[in-house]
Amino acid sequence: MQTIIWNHLSETEKRKVIMRPVQQNGENIQQAVNAIRENVAYNGDRALFELCEKFDGVKLDKLIVSADEIQAASSRISVKLRNAIEQAKTNIEAFHKAQQNQEIDLEIQEGVRCQVVTRPISCVGLYIPGGSAPLFSTVLMLAIPAKIAGCKKIVLCSPPPISDEILYTAHLCGVETIYAIGGAQAVFAMAQGTESVAKVDKIFGPGNAFVTEAKRQVAQNSTAIDMPAGPSEVLVIADESADPEFVASDLLSQAEHGADSQVILVATCETLAKETALAIERQLALLPRAETARKALNHSRIFIAESLEQAVEISNEYAPEHLIVQTKNARKLLPYLDNAGSIFLGAYSPESMGDYASGTNHVLPTYGYTKTYSSLGLADFSKRMTVQELTPKGFKNLAETVEVMAEAEQLAAHKMAVSVRLAKLNI
């Protein structure tokens, strides 16, 4: 990791050094995803079977995972892992239940009643990546709030063969239907519907560049998505009180996600920065994914800030997905931290806790989107509607205000909708 003293940079250099690596979602990916979209649209299930064999190397005779298969998978999960998943589920449920909205019902003025009511999104689709490290924890993060929100139908897609852990966790969380479909084709199947796959209203979940591009495309039509996605990232603010071994482990826990991940340390102490760099090398030697982590470290940075105030400014400008604060009084910085997906305060709040079991959601905006997007929560699985109800007296008292405004905007029909009612009231 390159170490840079922040105050030695010009304003132009500062903007440049906190830029993320360019995402390689080029024309080739877009063209490939376009072809998959058209194939699924025209050929439905047949396309899904063909693409599964082509990309996953699995020849399926059905797309829906049977209850017997789910039961068999669940029986192979160790008691130790079951207990861990159930503990995480309990914590995540508690935190997301606390997010349930109180409905707003106000009399704004006499005879004018306004409300906000919340309704669940009817049908949601969850995408869970497969591969050598199945992300069953993401099932918890998506299915639990969907269930609490009251979504009527929850379906899940994951590339075959689906891991036992994913099947067990999905069943535990009440997912009704599981499809053995992966990649961009899964996104298009859920967005468009096929003979076997239910069309959904909103799609959630992470994925590779092809899945991300597919989600971008469906979001331009009639299917909503959770949020824009990019490579995973973490920024750590640390002062002289921080433990370099802790800081190094937090940086590496993010770097091991992928070669395109980025990790940033903003330290107010050069000694800590040097000790952390040495600790990273020691810990790297112990990691199975050391090669991946090292690639991520190649485009990561250590910034030396003159103060915690400056460290906060750097963090707010970078707007990280994960923000870890390892300082003497971490909570004192919280009021000044504006842009982050999830914040981890103190030496004993590693990102791993939020990734799995503290209760917060690990589905977070990346690539600077935390300036405008929030971490996933219960609200993402529901929608708000406003309601207004006026009595004749309330209508009469507000009528002139609306007529004047409608006339000023030259919308005669808007004014007429008020005038005809006033006439009926014999005013």
Curated annotation (Swiss-Prot):
Q: What CDD domains does the annotation carry?
A: Histidinol_dh
Catalysed reaction(s)? Answer: L-histidinol + 2 NAD(+) + H2O = L-histidine + 2 NADH + 3 H(+)
- Asked if the keyword Oxidoreductase belongs to this entry, the reply reads yes
Under what name is this protein listed?
Answer: Histidinol dehydrogenase
How the cofactor is bound: the record states: Binds 1 zinc ion per subunit.
According to the UniProt record, one GO cellular component term is:
cytosol
| Family matches, as NCBIfam families | hisD
**The organism's taxonomic lineage, starting at the top:** Bacteria, Pseudomonadati, Pseudomonadota, Gammaproteobacteria, Pasteurellales
List the keywords (alphabetical). Answer: Amino-acid biosynthesis, Histidine biosynthesis, Metal-binding, NAD, Oxidoreductase, Zinc
